[in-house]
Protein backbone atom coordinates (compact mmCIF):
# COMPACT_ATOMS: atom_id res chain seq x y z
CA UNK A 1 0.00 0.00 0.00
CA UNK A 2 1.38 3.35 -0.99
CA UNK A 3 1.64 5.83 1.79
CA UNK A 4 1.27 9.52 1.02
CA UNK A 5 4.15 11.82 1.70
CA UNK A 6 2.81 15.26 2.45
CA UNK A 7 4.06 18.78 2.80
CA UNK A 8 2.57 22.16 3.42
CA UNK A 9 4.55 24.67 1.43
CA UNK A 10 4.48 28.30 2.47
CA UNK A 11 4.61 31.41 0.37
CA UNK A 12 6.93 34.29 1.16
CA UNK A 13 5.53 36.14 4.14
CA UNK A 14 6.64 37.56 7.46
CA UNK A 15 5.97 35.76 10.70
CA UNK A 16 6.66 32.32 12.11
CA UNK A 17 6.35 29.23 9.91
CA UNK A 18 3.03 27.43 9.84
CA UNK A 19 3.03 24.32 11.94
CA UNK A 20 0.26 22.31 10.37
CA UNK A 21 -1.73 20.88 13.24
CA UNK A 22 -5.32 19.77 13.35
CA UNK A 23 -7.72 21.79 15.46
CA UNK A 24 -10.90 20.06 14.47
CA UNK A 25 -12.20 16.61 15.37
CA UNK A 26 -11.11 17.06 18.98
CA UNK A 27 -7.49 18.04 18.34
CA UNK A 28 -5.82 21.09 19.94
CA UNK A 29 -5.91 24.47 18.22
CA UNK A 30 -2.58 25.30 16.52
CA UNK A 31 -0.62 28.43 17.35
CA UNK A 32 -1.84 31.34 15.23
CA UNK A 33 0.20 32.55 12.29
CA UNK A 34 1.04 36.28 12.07
CA UNK A 35 1.53 37.80 8.61
CA UNK A 36 1.80 41.31 7.17
CA UNK A 37 0.71 42.50 3.72
CA UNK A 38 0.19 45.78 1.87
CA UNK A 39 -3.44 46.79 1.35
CA UNK A 40 -4.89 45.28 -1.83
CA UNK A 41 -1.89 42.98 -2.45
CA UNK A 42 -2.12 39.20 -2.72
CA UNK A 43 -0.65 37.21 0.18
CA UNK A 44 -0.09 33.46 -0.17
CA UNK A 45 -1.06 31.96 3.19
CA UNK A 46 -0.03 28.41 2.34
CA UNK A 47 0.49 25.94 -0.48
CA UNK A 48 -1.08 22.63 0.57
CA UNK A 49 0.38 20.00 -1.72
CA UNK A 50 0.31 16.22 -1.27
CA UNK A 51 1.89 13.50 -3.37
CA UNK A 52 2.43 9.75 -3.51
CA UNK A 53 5.78 7.92 -3.70
CA UNK A 54 5.79 8.31 -7.49
CA UNK A 55 5.55 12.14 -7.10
CA UNK A 56 2.01 12.21 -8.50
CA UNK A 57 -0.36 14.72 -6.89
CA UNK A 58 -2.90 13.49 -4.36
CA UNK A 59 -6.06 15.57 -4.12
CA UNK A 60 -6.60 18.04 -1.30
CA UNK A 61 -9.74 19.92 -0.26
CA UNK A 62 -9.36 23.34 1.37
CA UNK A 63 -12.25 24.82 3.36
CA UNK A 64 -12.32 28.35 4.75
CA UNK A 65 -14.14 27.94 8.07
CA UNK A 66 -13.90 31.58 9.16
CA UNK A 67 -13.56 34.02 6.27
CA UNK A 68 -11.78 37.34 6.78
CA UNK A 69 -13.93 40.34 7.74
CA UNK A 70 -12.01 42.78 5.53
CA UNK A 71 -10.94 40.79 2.50
CA UNK A 72 -11.25 37.57 0.56
CA UNK A 73 -9.53 34.20 0.53
CA UNK A 74 -9.30 32.21 -2.67
CA UNK A 75 -8.04 28.69 -3.24
CA UNK A 76 -6.34 28.27 -6.61
CA UNK A 77 -4.47 25.43 -8.30
CA UNK A 78 -0.77 25.88 -8.90
CA UNK A 79 2.58 24.16 -9.19
CA UNK A 80 4.41 23.91 -5.88
CA UNK A 81 7.90 22.62 -5.09
CA UNK A 82 8.11 19.54 -2.85
CA UNK A 83 10.13 20.70 0.17
CA UNK A 84 10.60 19.43 3.75
CA UNK A 85 7.98 20.40 6.31
CA UNK A 86 8.27 20.40 10.13
CA UNK A 87 5.16 18.25 10.53
CA UNK A 88 5.42 15.84 7.63
CA UNK A 89 9.20 15.58 7.38
CA UNK A 90 11.31 14.90 4.33
CA UNK A 91 9.77 15.04 0.85
CA UNK A 92 11.67 11.83 0.06
CA UNK A 93 12.60 11.19 -3.57
CA UNK A 94 10.20 13.95 -4.67
CA UNK A 95 12.30 16.74 -3.10
CA UNK A 96 12.60 19.69 -5.45
CA UNK A 97 9.97 18.31 -7.84
CA UNK A 98 7.19 20.61 -9.07
CA UNK A 99 3.85 19.05 -8.12
CA UNK A 100 0.34 20.35 -8.83
CA UNK A 101 -1.25 21.51 -5.59
CA UNK A 102 -3.20 24.44 -4.27
CA UNK A 103 -2.49 27.94 -2.99
CA UNK A 104 -4.51 29.70 -0.31
CA UNK A 105 -4.40 33.43 -1.14
CA UNK A 106 -5.65 36.41 0.91
CA UNK A 107 -6.44 39.87 -0.49
CA UNK A 108 -7.75 42.77 1.61
CA UNK A 109 -10.51 45.11 0.59
CA UNK A 110 -9.08 48.07 -1.39
CA UNK A 111 -7.84 50.79 0.97
CA UNK A 112 -8.30 48.69 4.13
CA UNK A 113 -5.65 49.14 6.84
CA UNK A 114 -5.81 47.21 10.09
CA UNK A 115 -6.07 43.64 11.30
CA UNK A 116 -7.88 40.72 9.72
CA UNK A 117 -8.23 37.06 10.68
CA UNK A 118 -8.97 33.87 8.76
CA UNK A 119 -9.28 30.18 9.65
CA UNK A 120 -9.08 27.39 7.10
CA UNK A 121 -8.40 23.68 7.06
CA UNK A 122 -7.47 21.13 4.47
CA UNK A 123 -7.87 17.38 4.08
CA UNK A 124 -6.08 15.25 1.49
CA UNK A 125 -7.62 12.28 -0.29
CA UNK A 126 -5.40 10.14 1.95
CA UNK A 127 -6.71 11.65 5.19
CA UNK A 128 -3.85 14.06 6.03
CA UNK A 129 -5.39 17.12 7.65
CA UNK A 130 -4.39 20.43 9.15
CA UNK A 131 -5.93 23.71 10.23
CA UNK A 132 -4.48 27.22 10.24
CA UNK A 133 -5.48 30.32 12.22
CA UNK A 134 -3.99 33.37 10.50
CA UNK A 135 -3.78 36.92 11.88
CA UNK A 136 -3.07 39.40 9.10
CA UNK A 137 -1.85 42.96 9.56
CA UNK A 138 -2.82 45.01 6.50
CA UNK A 139 -0.88 48.24 6.04
Positions of predicted regions on the chain:
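Positively charged n-region of N-terminal signal peptides that target proteins for export
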Residues: 1-4
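Bacterial N-terminal signal peptides
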Residues: 7-17
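Extracellular interdomain linkers/hinges and stalk-like, low-complexity segments
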Residues: 21-67, 125-139
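Surface-exposed or secretory-pathway low-complexity segments enriched in glycine-proline
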Residues: 53-101
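Extracellular/luminal low-complexity segments enriched in Ser/Thr/Pro
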Residues: 103-113
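A short beta-strand micro-motif common to beta-rich folds, especially ectodomain repeats
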Residues: 112-125
